[in-house]
Amino acid sequence: WISGFTGSAGTAVILMDKAGLWTDSRYFLQATKELEGSDITLYKEMLPETPSITEFLCQHLKPGESVSIDGKMFSVQQVEQMKEELAAHQLQVDIFGDPLSSIWKNRPAMPDSPAFIYDIKYAGKSCEEKISAIRTELKKKGVYALFISALDEIAWTLNLRGNDVHCNPVIVSYLLITQDEVTYFISPEKVTAEVETYLKERQIGIQKYDE
């Protein structure tokens, strides 16, 4: 919305006097065309002459200034690395929610197509078997919990499918697996009575997507 770029992978950086969009080689041609005529500069990732996002910020911001990010869009590791690199230039990272929510008035709603069960004869293994295998690996690594945000991994783990992404049978959701419980974060309207029963029978808790 803010750039006009329609590719599936990219990061926009908006400063008071300039803006940039970082994307990978899959979208160089597309982004060049879609950003044409805008005030947004395309930065082609992985090319030697392209500054990283933090390098760009350090070049154009003054010590003491802050960088705001949507915490939902970055992993903990990414945030920690960003904080470390920016702190070296006396820049601060502030983590907020979605910065566009108050200005994008006609934003399309989240997809709400219902989830459905993927038959075991196609899945090969039950979700109980898969969760057990995940917990075994967590124990080996001395890890208590695994938070899964990759939609294909969630679909595989739970043997659930959906229609939230064009040509990709996944469901917009999150999954938290600990040694003691499993919690599935999903919009309530996606959960049919059949899916709710399926999850409860497997001791999988259900929470709202934005909890």
PLM feature segments, named:
Residues 1-62, 66, 74, 78-211:
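N-terminal accessory/capping or targeting/presequence segment of soluble
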